[in-house]
Design a protein with these regions (language model features):
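A short glycine-rich, Lys/Arg-flanked "PGG" loop and its adjoining helix->strand segment in the class I
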Residues: 219-233
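S-adenosyl-L-methionine
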Residues: 155-199
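Conserved beta-strand signature within the Rossmann-like core of class I S-adenosyl-L-methionine
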Residues: 234-242
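Conserved class I S-adenosyl-L-methionine
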Residues: 126-137, 153
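Conserved SAM-binding loop of SAM-dependent methyltransferases across substrates and taxa
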Residues: 137-149
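Class I S-adenosyl-L-methionine
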Residues: 243-280
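N-terminal auxiliary segments of SAM/dcSAM-dependent transferases
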Residues: 1-90
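Conserved alpha-helix/loop element of class I SAM-dependent methyltransferases that forms part
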Residues: 110-128
Length: 280
């Protein structure tokens, strides 16, 4: 899918742009790519210009929503197929996303992009072939690229999430020549596609599945056995579990994960908000 290169607005950015216009300024400087860079817009009374393209001023925008230019107007970065999937701004710049209102990335203490850096560091990706089971917005993959991974095999099941990646400037572009083909992104269900991955062909893995109630197959013994099969001995796996409430879910998911991974052939230790597993 082609990447979006136009401006992205959140409510605060719109307010700042309109305030500059109303104050009679001829220019406004700020970020129109969710804090990734700074730029300057030329202001006129009825329209404004950015990177040589003329746009109408955005209307009043909703909070917790990111807007992009669809060629006719500024619209929400969201889609509804089987679920409502939405790109959501954070105070850190790099956005998170939600599926039916459920936040898919941690944002309470730090940027989800920074959170990904800490987790990727656990598997020491430099020079390695990395399996990224649930690509999401691609922050794990981006951090693996930055850390010098030789190759990242990334899977994402949801087409709407892949579409969000084309809007999000923080998401890595698999087709960017600067990445030298190291990121291989596939639109596929990893619970099925992993059967096609060769034995002991992966040096390290990152597993950040949706919650158990959404994707129980990604917590199954069958899937963990496949992870053990494709990882070489000594290979590291970080598995995000979070801290689901046992009283509301009726399950101790982290304990279940640990038991199944050990049965599959991993040695475990707690790390961050998940487990770090070593292939025995």
């Amino acid at each position: 899918m082609p990447r979006y290169i136009g401006p992205l607005f959140v409510r605060a950015t719109t307010q700042a742009l309109l305030a500059a216009r109303d104050a009679g300024a001829g220019e406004w400087s700020g970020s129109l790519d969710l804090g990734l860079s700074q730029g300057t817009a030329l202001l006129q009374s009825e329209a404004w210009q950015w990177r040589g393209v003329r746009y109408p001023y955005p209307p009043s925008l909703k909070d917790r929503t990111i807007y992009y230019w669809d060629g006719d107007e500024f619209v929400s970065a969201a889609r509804f197929s089987s679920s409502l999937i939405k790109l959501v701004p954070t105070e850190w710049g790099a956005p998170t996303f939600e599926i039916d209102g459920i936040k898919m990335l941690p944002t309470s203490k730090q940027s989800p992009f920074e959170d990904a850096r800490h987790k990727v560091a656990l598997i020491e990706p430099r020079g390695k072939r990395v399996l990224d089971t649930c690509g999401g917005l691609g922050y794990f993959a981006a951090r693996c690229l930055q850390a010098g991974a030789a190759r990242i095999d990334s899977f994402e099941k949801n087409a709407d999430v892949l579409w969000l990646r084309t809007l999000n400037p923080w998401s890595p572009d698999a087709e960017d020549p600067a990445n030298e083909g190291r990121l291989q992104l596939r639109h596929a269900d990893v619970s099925l596609a992993i059967s096609q991955v060769a034995d002991a062909s992966i040096d390290a893995a990152l597993h950040d599945p949706p919650r158990f109630g959404i994707a129980g197959e990604l917590y199954s013994q069958v899937f963990y056995d496949h992870l053990a099969r494709v990882l070489r001995r000594g290979g590291k796996l970080f598995h995000y579990t979070g801290s689901p409430n046992k009283l509301t879910t009726g399950r101790d998911v982290p304990r279940e994960v640990a038991k199944r991974l050990e049965k599959a052939g991993f040695k475990l230790q707690l790390a961050l908000d998940g487990v770090l597993a070593l292939r025995r």
